[in-house]
């Protein structure tokens, strides 16, 4: 329960909701999922794309409290632990069509505000995502090394909100990687003498 604000966006994936929710690219956004069922295969920690849930709220058609995958845990408990508000029984395809026709906009999920006028006022006061500096909220705070230290090639990764799968793909290519915070000076990165540089999405 509570209020959750953010830019409303959507994802049409049939699976992978945990990866979507933990993707730093979606930081602070309200996620609309067009897949009919969300939560039916639970949550596995190893499938998270970052250390936290990045969406600010979930809007879905059917939310499943039951799940059927060995070793998984409840999406409901996962969202509750991360203080993420979700709303279900929504015609998400109609919402997606509205977003497509009207463009990016802020929205709110609320269990507390009963006045439409108050909701409209608070939405008007909520900052638009365009132009916001968000890299500092999703980037690593300290540099770290991953991969094979005996690799022939070293790659410096600038973290603007990188997903775990991108790092895994670089590691699978055989690179030794050092991940740097978004605001690291180039001269500091050069001290490691990397063979290549990778600037993440975010």
Spans of model-derived segments:
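RNA-binding accessory domains that recognize and position tRNA/RNA substrates
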Residues: 1-187, 191-192
């Amino acid at each position: 329960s509570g209020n959750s604000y953010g830019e409303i966006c959507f994802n049409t994936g049939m699976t992978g909701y945990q990866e979507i929710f933990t993707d730093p690219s979606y930081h602070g956004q309200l996620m609309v999922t067009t897949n009919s069922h969300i939560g039916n295969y639970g949550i596995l920690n190893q499938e998270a794309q970052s250390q936290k849930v990045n969406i600010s709220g979930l809007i879905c058609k059917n939310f499943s409290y039951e799940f059927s995958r060995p070793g998984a845990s409840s999406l409901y408990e996962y969202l509750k632990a991360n203080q993420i508000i979700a709303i279900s029984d929504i015609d998400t395809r109609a919402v997606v069509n509205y977003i497509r026709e009207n463009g990016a906009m802020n929205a709110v999920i609320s269990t507390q505000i009963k006045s439409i006028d108050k909701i409209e006022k608070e939405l008007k006061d909520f900052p638009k995502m365009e132009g916001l500096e968000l890299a500092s909220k999703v980037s690593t705070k300290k540099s770290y090394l991953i991969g094979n230290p005996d690799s022939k090639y070293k790659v410096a990764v600038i973290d603007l909100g990188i997903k775990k799968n991108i790092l895994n793909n670089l590691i699978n290519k055989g690179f030794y990687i050092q991940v740097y915070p978004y605001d690291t000076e180039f001269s500091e990165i050069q001290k490691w003498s990397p063979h290549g540089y990778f600037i993440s999405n975010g």
